[in-house]
């Protein structure tokens, strides 16, 4: 037998065996994939031919106390291209450049980019989006989205806040109530062929979006408008740095208005305000393009800042409301108690002056309050002592925050009890050497005159689903009694006398009983001679339904609170009291004060 033939047959046999083994292995693998992994690969194949697109949910609206929409949504479009679906790139580039006003190089780069989806432009007006859709360009998608829109532009800008590019809240109520306002996006799954082109009339899975809840708030657009108008008048007349006004219902803490002028345009929040009073900021606003990014962001943060809650200041004589209430509640002073004011008071080694250089002479405590006499309130503070004063400072809720439903509330800056000597006690008694926020002052004053119940300042009333099927009411229970009804009634009487016969006369309003207190506080450092003029008022004095606080930062010329701040609140009340249904009356205040 031929040995070569035998060897050749063996080689053929080995090769046949190897082929058989490979075939069996491939058959086994194929059987495994077809039987056991078919579901997996079917899903992969389906995924390759499915395209998921988001259906944006509408953000909930913000609605004022009268049902007026003050934060809404506008339909806008996002223009994008899908590379595999574009059939005429030059035509697509030409149309998009022309209609969107974009640079050709930019559009070409995006149209020719090999990606599943490339965004050309966002926030395109719906009218223009519809026009582009009408071209029926292969591979060009026009998807509808929502953009936040504020019908009143700058009204209550630092209260409402605004949203970012992702339609999420950034500042103000927009961020505080984000979980209620934001909706839940839906999605749509469409089928496409091997080239990625959508198959028309193919079955699709669709999950509908759920719109966010509407937020109903206590802010009243009409009161806010008028308060802003008055604030801007003062800002311009006194060339002030800024002006703030807070309007509150002292019975429950509902905020009807909160003004911080200059405000900014909510529909264009990243452009520096050209109305900034500070010369340095004006120059920066005019040179926005030249500002480093970090510097511009710093200026934007300053522009967005809500003075009423984010900033602290020395309240000055408006804080005498707290000292008087503590003194009366503790019993260390009564209205007819006699005091003497020679124009100063010496405490330890310090000579602390009254605003009236020649002094007020002999006066009762009531007269001292009407005259806003520093020595009288220094004496009341000394009678209380450090322990007593600290007790009421804490009891009245001044050491903590108010709990207002806005982000970034600043805390009170106060001496530590162990570091508070008689001099510090003296200056605190008439509103100096410590700092609080305007919202803390008005909240505490409201709690003193409303019968003695500590309230929580707030805007949020309820969140209502788009289909009205769900209503979530926000609760703000009283934080407890801080002083007796008797002391509260006495304080209402005292503060009415301040307006009717004392330093707050310019807030007097014919036919109405108004209570209030003036203040002129000197800013730090004292050497600069810069002032904050303020006035806090409420009406009717015997049954407070509305309270307002104005602060005027660095007014030029005459700067006394009783002269420039009190008249503003008088004008405000003249317009909003009838609007709120509070009728004028010539009756005298019916207040019973024990041991007058």
Could you tell me what each predicted segment is?
Residues 71, 193-204, 219, 250-318, ...:
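Beta-lactam-recognizing serine transpeptidase/beta-lactamase-like catalytic domain environment
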């Amino acid at each position: 037998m031929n040995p070569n033939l035998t060897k050749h047959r063996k080689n053929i046999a080995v090769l046949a065996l190897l082929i058989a083994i490979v075939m069996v292995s491939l058959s086994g693998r194929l059987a495994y994939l077809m039987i056991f992994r078919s579901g997996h690969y079917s899903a992969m194949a389906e995924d390759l031919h499915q395209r998921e697109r988001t259906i944006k949910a509408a953000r909930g609206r913000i609605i004022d106390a009268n049902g007026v929409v003050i934060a809404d949504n506008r339909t806008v479009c996002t223009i994008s291209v899908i590379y595999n679906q574009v059939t005429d790139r030059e035509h697509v580039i030409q149309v998009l450049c022309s209609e969107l006003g974009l640079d050709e190089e930019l559009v070409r780069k995006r149209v020719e980019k090999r990606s599943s989806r490339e965004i050309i432009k966002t926030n395109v007006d719906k009218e223009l989006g519809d026009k582009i859709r009408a071209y029926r360009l292969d591979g060009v998608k026009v998807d509808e989205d929502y953009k936040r829109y504020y019908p009143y532009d700058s009204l209550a800008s630092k209260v409402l806040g605004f949203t970012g590019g992702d339609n999420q809240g950034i500042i103000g109520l927009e961020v505080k109530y984000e979980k209620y306002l934001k909706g839940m996006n839906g999605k749509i799954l469409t089928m496409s062929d091997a080239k990625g082109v959508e198959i028309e009339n193919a079955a699709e899975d669709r999950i509908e979006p759920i719109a966010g809840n509407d937020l109903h708030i206590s802010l009243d657009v009409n009161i806010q408008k008028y308060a802003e108008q008055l604030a801007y008048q003062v800002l311009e007349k006194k060339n002030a740095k800024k002006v703030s006004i807070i309007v509150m219902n002292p019975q429950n803490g509902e905020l009807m208005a909160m003004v911080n002028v200059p405000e900014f345009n909510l529909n264009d929040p990243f452009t520096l305000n050209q109305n900034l009073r500070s010369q340095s900021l004006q120059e920066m606003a005019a040179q926005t393009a030249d500002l480093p990014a970090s510097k511009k962001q710093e200026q934007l943060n300053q522009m967005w800042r809500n003075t009423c809650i984010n900033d602290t200041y020395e309240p000055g004589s408006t804080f005498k409301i707290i000292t008087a209430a503590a003194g009366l509640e503790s019993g260390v002073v009564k209205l007819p108690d006699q005091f003497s004011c020679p124009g100063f008071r010496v405490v330890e080694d310090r000579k602390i002056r009254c605003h009236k250089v020649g002094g007020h002479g002999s006066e009762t405590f009531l007269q001292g309050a009407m005259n806003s006499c520093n020595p009288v309130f220094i004496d009341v503070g000394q009678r209380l002592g450090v322990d007593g004063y600290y007790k009421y400072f804490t009891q009245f809720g001044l050491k903590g925050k108010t709990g207002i439903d806005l982000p970034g509330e600043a805390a009170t800056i106060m001496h530590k009890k162990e570091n508070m000597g008689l001099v510090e006690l003296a200056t605190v008694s008439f509103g100096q050497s410590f700092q609080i926020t305007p919202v803390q002052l008005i909240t505490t004053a409201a709690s003193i005159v409303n019968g003695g119940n500590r309230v929580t300042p707030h805007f949020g009333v309820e969140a209502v689903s788009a289909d009205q099927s769900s209503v979530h009411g926000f609760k703000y229970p009283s934080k407890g009694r801080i002083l007796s009804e008797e002391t509260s009634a006495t304080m209402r009487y005292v503060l009415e006398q301040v307006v009717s016969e004392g330093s707050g006369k310019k807030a007097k309003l014919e036919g109405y009983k108004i209570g209030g207190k003036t203040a002129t506080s000197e800013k730090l450092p004292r050497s600069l001679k810069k002032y904050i003029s303020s006035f806090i008022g409420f009406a009717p004095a015997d049954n407070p339904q509305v309270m307002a606080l104005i602060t005027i930062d660095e007014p030029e010329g005459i700067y006394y609170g009783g002269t420039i701040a009190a008249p503003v609140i008088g004008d405000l009340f003249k317009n909003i009291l009838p609007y709120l249904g509070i009728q004028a009356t010539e009756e005298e205040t019916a207040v019973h004060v024990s041991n007058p």
